[in-house]
Amino acid sequence: SRLMSPQPIKGTRALILFVFGFIPVCTGFLIPFSHLLVESYKRIQYAGFSEYLLQASMNTLTLASIATFITILIGFLIVSAARFSRNTWFSRIASLGYAIPGTVLAIGLMLSLGALDHAVADFLEFKLGISTGLLFLGTSFTLIYAYAVRFLAISIGGIESGYNRIHGVIDDAARNLGQNRRGILWRVHFPLLRPAIISAALLIFVDCMKELPATLLLRPLNMETLATQLYAEASRGTYEDGAIAALLIVLVGLIPVILLA
């Protein structure tokens, strides 16, 4: 079979194809993005960058950063273990979280962690006389845990694609040079996997920023993120007041698109 090669197009045909390709970009991105810019500028000119929006931005940045780090670390360890053991069943099971809707995942965590909370609270109260209340539900820990379970598939998939570019001959050469598994992992694999890890981390960070169902159900009381604040404005019908939050999410989401293009 012969590989297909791109064919140059000129004249009217090229113009028509350009217009057809530009229409979805214009209607699906440029026009909405321009509207967000205009409305955000109006809100900043009128009321400035509010304290609530700043706090929501900091909450979003903190939660997404911690969740991204944990998810990448777990994914790296899982895929590396599969590399050495030649067994990928655990990585396949760990990737199932991405197929579960955020609402279903959040409800499942609420039920399981709620039962664990009550069991721990009862034990501490009867054995030590300490009343703790809920230790997991309604905390940032539960939300970060949900993010990690939800987006672990992105970490595993990205790192696996990086591992596919590392030939087994490199591992054999490292062993011949006296490296054990730990040395191969951190001195050989990790430096070669950095581009794949960074790409996966960017995608996970953006997904954590815009994850709404799990955040609404599991967030601590009085904690707002950019996604929940945007949802609150939309539910009140004040769409333009959520323009700044929406613009920030879009701008951060553009980073991996530009870098991965």
Language-model features: where?
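C-terminal transmembrane helix and the adjacent membrane-cytosol boundary/short C-terminal tail
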Residues: 1-8, 78-86, 160-171, 175, ...
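Membrane-interfacial helix termini and adjacent extracytoplasmic/periplasmic loops
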Residues: 2-7, 42, 50-54, 86, ...
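Short membrane-interfacial helix/loop motifs at transmembrane-helix boundaries
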Residues: 3, 23-61, 65, 69, ...
